[in-house]
UniProtKB/Swiss-Prot annotation:
It comes from Salmonella typhi. The keyword Transcription does not apply. It is found in: Cytoplasm. Keywords: Cytoplasm, Phosphopantetheine, Phosphoprotein. This is Probable acyl carrier protein IacP. One of its GO terms (molecular function) is acyl carrier activity. InterPro entries: ACP, ACP-like_sf, PP-bd_ACP. NCBIfam families: PRK08172.1 (NF006031).
Amino acid sequence: MNMDIEARVKKVITSCIAVDVDSINGQTHLVEDLYADSLDLIDIVFGLSEEFDISCNENDLPDMTTFADICRVVKKSLESRV
């Protein structure tokens, strides 16, 4: 995975949820590990849309349960723009 994408995704997550950036790794689960609630998840989706200028909405949430999942969705969205 692109390290720039990972760093930017971490930035979005930590701006929406009060967690330490070092506590996030590929298998970090948003709900189980970071205790994100539904509003946090929506904030993350909209934050990703703004950060990466991609079309991302709450319909993408089922595919975005872990940090690695989020990075994959973002990367796929960025690649489809090209």
